[in-house]
Curated annotation (Swiss-Prot):
Lineage: Bacteria, Pseudomonadati, Pseudomonadota, Gammaproteobacteria, Enterobacterales
Annotated catalysed reactions: sulfate + ATP + H(+) = adenosine 5'-phosphosulfate + diphosphate
MF term (GO), any: sulfate adenylyltransferase (ATP) activity
E.C. number(s) listed in UniProt: 2.7.7.4
Cross-referenced CDD domains: Sulfate_adenylyltransferase_2 (cd23946)
Protein name per UniProt: Sulfate adenylyltransferase subunit 2
Amino acid sequence: MDQKRLTHLRQLEAESIHIIREVAAEFSNPVMLYSIGKDSSVMLHLARKAFYPGTLPFPLLHVDTGWKFREMYEFRDRTAKAYGCELLVHKNPEGVAMGINPFVHGSAKHTDIMKTEGLKQALNKYGFDAAFGGARRDEEKSRAKERIYSFRDRFHRWDPKNQRPELWHNYNGQINKGESIRVFPLSNWTEQDIWQYIWLENIDIVPLYLAAERPVLERDGMLMMIDDNRINLQSGEVIKKRMVRFRTLGCWPLTGAVESNAQTLPEIIEEMLVSTTSERQGRVIDRDQAGSMELKKRQGYF
């Protein structure tokens, strides 16, 4: 394939499809982590392209915390059904029994038990040796230094000082029993690339990414959208309808909205061209402590 004749987005697309096919051929039991966000939607679209007209040769896995937006759950089930994907949903049973939730136990403990431990449980349960993730290098500094093939030991831990070299497009997938690889086919994409590709390919996304009047309150410097009745209002807090959208999606008590009037994909792309902040500024879990994302990844996080 002549790279000089491909547009920037088509080069990224070709690279990602190559990575997805490489993993499917090289590993015995891969899985695609599906978190329902825009990056997951693009990654799923690329995987479907990679194996068209056949079906995906691996399942989707959603590690559920029980605190995603209702629109995310509806979108997840609708998408899996529409594309004929095998969807596995895992929720940490110990965390459920303990009643872990972000309001009572805080973002760090909630994330560790319901997401990190939940993911490790699911990978062990099904014996997956490779897991696709939608992380990109431009999102956060610890992700910027992570390889496309990210080696994890038998405890699912990542050691940033012991990463394998990746020369050109040669990836080292050699692992021993119990070890695994996290694979990031969108590593070289930016947030702007993602949105332009969604618009170019007409990819369906969760409506929460588009601006609309939604019930929100201000807490800890964040606009929190109230998605159900599991919240206790603090003194002086008032729920108001405001025009907001989300740049990133996660558990609703831990994901801040941004004020915006961007109701279409071209308007989002235009908004991104002048944005000077990271999309993850609204993620409470990234504020837990200095280097919190790298620490989480060392412990087995996505």
